[in-house]
Amino acid sequence: MVIGSFPVGKIFIHGVKRISKPFGDLLIWMGKHHPFIRRYIIIPPAQLYNTFEVRSKLRMLRLKQPRRIPPLSTPVATRLGADMLSEAFVFGIGAGLIYYELSKTYTKTKKQNQEIEDQKRVLDECVDCISADVERNQREINWIKAALKNVEK
């Protein structure tokens, strides 16, 4: 990735990584003080993750699957959900940066390819003009040769 070669890019990436912890702490605080955010934004991803984790561990151990997985307690689910959302935030920024770099590279490559195509077209036109000049000169040479043969006779 191009951004790794520039110090400013490395500093920015490091800053984004450093933001994830305060962002997670903010989510935990919001989860404690705002029941709507806790109930509908932070806890559902944690409970879903817990369900997948327990079921996959039981599958790996080849144990019987329970019908219902007991939910996590509210503080544990809040902590896990906030950590997951803060990591998703950092991942989203990283994915956005990768997308930005790729789109910029794609645009640059597309522009270069267009310039190459334009140069090819110009060169083809020049070759066509030169070919027409060669044909015209060849006809004139043949006409001059024919005229010289007529003069010699």
Curated annotation (Swiss-Prot):
InterPro entries: OPA3-like (IPR010754). Signal peptide: none annotated. It comes from the Eukaryota. GO terms for biological process: regulation of lipid metabolic process. The keyword Nucleus does not apply. Residues 101-153 form a coiled coil. Keywords: Coiled coil. GO terms for cellular component: mitochondrion. The keyword Isomerase does not apply. Belongs to the OPA3 family. PANTHER family: OPTIC ATROPHY 3 PROTEIN (PTHR12499:SF0), OPTIC ATROPHY 3 PROTEIN OPA3 (PTHR12499). This is Putative OPA3-like protein CG43998.
